Structure formats: C-alpha cells, structure tokens
C-alpha cells in the first residue's frame, strides 16, 4: 500500500481496525508469563481464527501480532536470535487470516526501557532496534505500519524515523493518555499530533488507556491541529475483577454508540483495544460504516513544540521572543564552563529566560576548543530536562543541526537556511526529514543582497525550493537581516520594508537578531528598544533577544497593546504586576499567557531558580539551604553535591540537610506532580538528583548510627516484564530513608513472600502494567495471609484501581511513585 492509497482509503469512509488480541488470546488459553509471539507461533490456529472473525466483522486493517517482537523485548525471553523468523511468520499468519480482504499492519510498540537522559538507552540505539524489526516486517509483506500503545513521544519519533529509513509505507502512530489528558511523560494530544505529522506520520491518535467516552476530548484537541487522519482504538471500558477474572463491562452496542461520537469528533480510523471482541467490531462497523469522514485541516498552522508544550507563530498574533543567551559568543565564563564539560550555566540561562517570558530558546554551542556537535546534543538534553519551551537549533554546521534535529523530542526551529549551496541543497531536505520549521536567511553565495528587490528574489526562490520538497509558508520564518545602523544609516528602514513585504505580500512571519542594529553605539538599549517598537509596528513577528532586558520586553508588551492584538491588554497588565512585585522584593515567578502549563513554579525555592547554577561564595546557611532545595526541585543533578558541601560548610548537619531541605524539596516535587505541573521526566530528574545527595550523605549518617526507617520488598509480579514505574517507586522510597529490596520484574509470589519474611519487611510493594498479570497480585496477597507474613501489601500499575486493591485484600493502592511514599508512611504510622 502506498501512502497515497492509504490517504484515499481513509478519505472515502471510516476505516475499521481490528479489536483486542492479547485479552482474546488469553481467553483462548494463552498462559500468563509466556512470550505472546512464541505462543502464537506454537498455536497459529488460535490467532488465525480470531483475525478471520475480525475480517468477517468488517475490519479493514489487521494488526500483525509483532507487538513485542523487537530485540529488546525478545531478550526478556532469550529469543532475540529468533527475531527475523518470528516477525516473518507472524506477518504471514495475519496475511493468511486477511485473505486479501483486509490490509495487514506491522505492529511496533514501546521497549520498556528509559531513553537517555532518564535512562541508559541512547536514542540512536533505539532507532536501530526499531529499524531491525521494521525491515523484517516490511520484507515479510506488511501493507503498512502501526506504532501503538506508546507512552513516550520520543520513542514514537524513534520508531517513525526508523520506519522511514527502511521503507515508505504508511505509518499510523497511537499513544496512551492518562486521565489528566497527558501521556506518562507529559505530552498533551495536540503536541503529539503537531510533532508526529510534521515528522511524516500518516495518521495519529490514541489507544488503550480508557474506554471510548474518555477519548472524545483528546480527539477534539488533536482535530484542532491535525492535517492527517486521526485514529482511536479504545478499550471496552476499564478492567474490573469478577470472580477472579478480569472483565470489561462495555457491551458491543455501548461501544459502537460511543464510537459514532468519536467519528463525529474527528476520528477517521477506529477499532478496539483491550476487552473488545469481533462482536464489538461488528457493532462498530454497523454504527459508523456509512458516516461521513472528518477531513483533516488542509492548511497547516505554524507550530513549534517541545515534548510537553506547543506554541503557535501567528502573523497577527502576540509578539514572541526567542531567548538568545545560550550562546558562548562573548561570554567568557560560559566558554570556560563548556570547555570543562559543565552545563550548569546553560541550565540556569534556560530557566531564567523561561521565567522572564521567552517563548522559544535558541541553542548555539559555536566556539573553539570543544566538540561542538556533542556539546550541542548535551545542551539539548540538559535544556529539555529543565524547561518546557521549544528550541531553536542554531549552528553554522549542517551536520550539527542534523544531529540536533534527530534527537530533539519535539518540532524545532532551524537557525538558519539561506540560498547558499550547502544550506539550500543539504540542510533544507534535513529540515524536511525531521519536520522542522526554519528561519529563511535572505543570503546567497554572492553574499548580502544589494537592495530590496534582490532580497525579495532570494526569499521567493528559497520558498520555491522549499515548496518543491513538500514544505510551505507554514514552515518558514524570514530573517529581516538586520545590519548595523552605524555602517548603514538606512539599515532600520530596509528592515522595516522587509517586515512589511513578508507580512503583507508573502504572508510570512519574520524574525530578527535585534541587537545587531546598535552595534558600536553608546547606550544601545535605547536604540534597540526604539527599533523593536517600530519593527513590531511594521509587522515583525518575533525577535532573538535577551528576555531579561526589562525595557525591551516592556516595549514589546506595550506595542502589542497599542496594535490591539488579542489579549494584549491582559498580558501587559500581568507583566506590570509581575514587575511591581519583583521590584518590591516579592518572590514570584511570572507565567505569561501562552507558556507551558507548569512551566514556572511559584514559591520560595522556585523564585530562586537561578541560584541552582553554582556553589555560593557566601557562608550563609539560609542561602545554602535554598540552593540545596532548588537543586532538587529543578533536577540539577550535576551540581547538587556542590550545594550539599556548601551547606555542610555553612554548619548544617547531614540530618538537617536531609530532613530540612532534601525531603521538603522532593515533597514539593511530588505535589507538583500531583497537580500535573510536573510530569515523569521532572519527577525522575528530581529523584535522581536527590539520590546523588543521599548517597553522598549516607556515610556520614552511618557514623551517627542513623538507621533506615523500615525494610520494604518491591517487585513486578510474575508474568509482567515492565518495570519503569516500579523502578521509580524504589528510587523515591530510598530517597525517603527506607531500606528497599528490589526483586526486579517477573517475580514469583513465593520469592516475594519468602524474601519479605526473611528480611522482616514491613511492606511489600507490587507492580503490574498489564491487565493479564493483575491477578498475580491476588496470588501474593493470599500467600502472605497463608504463611502468616506480617507485611502490609500495597499495589499499583496502569490498570490497577482502588476497588481492585480492596477486592483482592491489599492494604493500599497508589496511582504513582509520589503517592506510594505517602501511602507507606501512613500505613507504618498506624502500627
């Protein structure tokens, strides 16, 4: 199937996907804990019968059962050397079941490993894992691909890049969302569709997670930005335990009724996930088969995105600032740090610029004496772990920009592409491949344009070249090419003409490097501010500038208000209130309209975020305390030891630091996580930062006879090989002073209970991601009672609920790692 054929199919009517595979195979006798792919190959008739029933029910696309047949997943069962044969045979089984009446999609999913910097799996290694599997699936004859049940946008990117480097088959991508409407890593539905459609996905949507009703709102969010079809594959409700069996209550008729609402909301491709059967798909086909298809947007919006937020660049929208400070040019202290391999100042600059109102951050690592490419990658990892803002990748080297775009977990802005041969022939296709926007720099191999007519010609030619490879005006921002007024008295007037031409004739947004205009002049801030105000009036959309310059920023806010831009009066008043409080010494962080939810944090520690960048010269203990607190709050793992040592030098004891600063900081992180202002990356980053501090202080605590609070045994239950959530629980509990015995994943009930009794553990913590392994938790609870083990049992996992915990007799349930600590504290306080 070609991508064009896929688009034609989806544009003609709602396309029906199949329903659940795993839950139906389990009903047919597949045991818990086996490798599903191997069991299918040993029992091929079961899969063929199920998928034939789906085809009879009206399915247009079957998912081949290659879901966990990647090298990383197969290694869990010692089957990695069977990868090629297994994927070939699994695709063949589905093609046999389809019988030419349905298409077959090769199915990829998450690996269960954490990507760097949260884990040890490098992005390029993950791309290779997906490429290996995708190549086999493509050669086996799959018609298209689906990347499904994804929790991480970055893993989605790796899979799409891998498939695109192997073949040009259609790609559908589907993520899972929590009740709060975000993925586990904090990505909202709109951001996901913006990033993935720009990267080359042919359809984007969501699956699993919830029942169909809860998917309507996320679908509507996606539909506002989607230029490709949307898909939905909901569960048949949430799983419940009935007489020891996991059941899904949503009937085929109920499922089909809400399925019709999903199609009305914008879904063009629809099927079922956990708990659905051929009967659900048959009812769905009857309900939606003749409904009109919601057509995606024909005109793209100018969108940039990080992993957790998106911003829109509008011709008549609010003026935007690209923070310029992360650039070593002229910054001797930053240059010295970069030569030492430190990115502490980069973190601080990112945080300060976000808090001062920048909407995008420019990253430039151009200097002698360092590996610029590696430093660019390290800076991107550091900044994306610190702030939510989208990035502008700034380098004069094509290979550095390509490396940065490849690993950036969002949709970036490239700074810049000119008509120079290297840029237009090599960098432009790279920007297209990775779905980036770019700054159009009106230069050619002949140098600066001689006049406006030549500049206009270069702009038109670069636009033509971009359109020839599938890009458009929505992917471009034009640089006004600001010259120094000291050398060219008409420099400002020429820029104003360019801004006006781009906005009014070309319908293109514009940007400029603001400070160039005043180079060599005294009191440059006045010149810069006057130029900015006049430039905005002539159509300038954004500027690369220092957002900490209050005069400049205030002029931008005032200019927007005078031009009567939407909500400009509210933004101006908010800005003035923020400055008033700031100048009165109040600790306050301003979050301007349109920035990321939770991008900045109000409070004592957050108000001093800039202090986390380096150790203090002062011996003041209060200052040291705030720095320790803030380092944990901001996840500054590379500098926490400097702050802890400074606190010790200032007179703090190890106990003071842990109980007075580290634990309060991680408590605040947990509260921010509960409020959905922090997400999994920030939680892990802060927890790892605290771990560094605890490990440093532990020997000192041992000398003072400090004992652990209690012993706990934690494990992922038998048959379940997922451990991301469990690992985070272990990390958090250790940070709070508990002695944790981590038994790992796929752990039998006997070993869990035996270990708890041998170690005199007071709590057993159980994790399960899959609905098929939930019942193993009940086995542990029953064995605890049978053997007279006194440990409390607490449980958690994606499909686990409070009612399930009560039904199996567990002592408690927590939805996440932060809540688990509170639960354990409460249980032990009662004893």
Predicted regions mapped to residue ranges:
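Domain-level signal for soluble alpha/beta catalytic cores
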Residues: 1-479, 483-831
